[in-house]
């Protein structure tokens, strides 16, 4: 029986991975590894760190069934060595013919690697879109796109970013947006197809609380929260947010504008990428005989 081989690329530097481990319990790449293996035990994962110096110890990129790029604390427009290494890696990934997926930084990286542009948020009242992206709407193209299968046409979702896509590359189509930002794209570039989202469908409330704590000082500095205590209060409230949970009146302030009753906690776009892009591509590419069991 065949097993999918997915390469997970952590977008963070070594120092930032250590910071996430302190506040969340693990680096983002480990979160995605657990998510994929919990979804289906037939998935084999490898983790790579393209921001780090030195050669990447991976198979040829065309040997993988999928390449998944996590979020990151980095800013793609800064000419840091780790950023430049990741752009080069993403360009090679596009040339490999392997299906790609990116979350937050992962989407921004793909946009830049394919010739687009990402800059700091230009929205006056939203220097950092967190803890939620509200009012996300599927575009006419996105409403029929398999990446968003089972999504409602409008939704709220966990989010954490201070940069935005300002120019799309050729071959890119927006599949979701809200009033402030491009929220999801498909990019056909080189030999590969990329699906990506600006928001974080992989996070639980507990995970998002850890993200807030990890970036607490910067959230106060950029005006997203008034004090570190305000960040902590928000983190405590969001850590308890899960399907069916009742939000106390004192915590409602942290969920302003969020439809908590219809909030979708499943990582739909990632699972749809596996089912609707990775698996069909692998069957064509490697001549699979149908051994994959979908959940």
Curated annotation (Swiss-Prot):
Q: Which InterPro entries match?
A: ChyE-like, Class_I_gatase-like, GATASE
Protein function = Involved in the degradation of isopropylamine, which is a constituent of the herbicides atrazine. Catalyzes the hydrolysis of gamma-glutamyl-L-alaninol (GALO) to L-alaninol and L-glutamate. It can also uses gamma-glutamyl-isopropylamide, gamma-glutamyl-ethylamide, L-glutamine, and gamma-glutamyl-p-nitroanilide.
- The UniProt record lists the Glutamine amidotransferase type-1 domain at 5-221
Print the keywords alphabetically: Hydrolase
- CDD domains for the chain: GATase1_1
EC annotation from Swiss-Prot or TrEMBL: 3.4.-.-
Q: Which GO terms describe its cellular component?
A: cytosol
Q: Known PROSITE patterns for this protein?
A: GATASE_TYPE_1
Q: Which Gene3D superfamilies does the annotation name?
A: 3.40.50.880
Query: What is the name of the gene encoding this protein?
Result: ipuF
Q: One Pfam family of this protein, by short name?
A: GATase
> In which organism is this protein found?
Pseudomonas sp
Q: What name does UniProt use for this protein?
A: Gamma-glutamyl-L-1-hydroxyisopropylamide hydrolase
PANTHER family hit by this protein: GLUTAMINE AMIDOTRANSFERASE YLR126C-RELATED (PTHR42695:SF5)
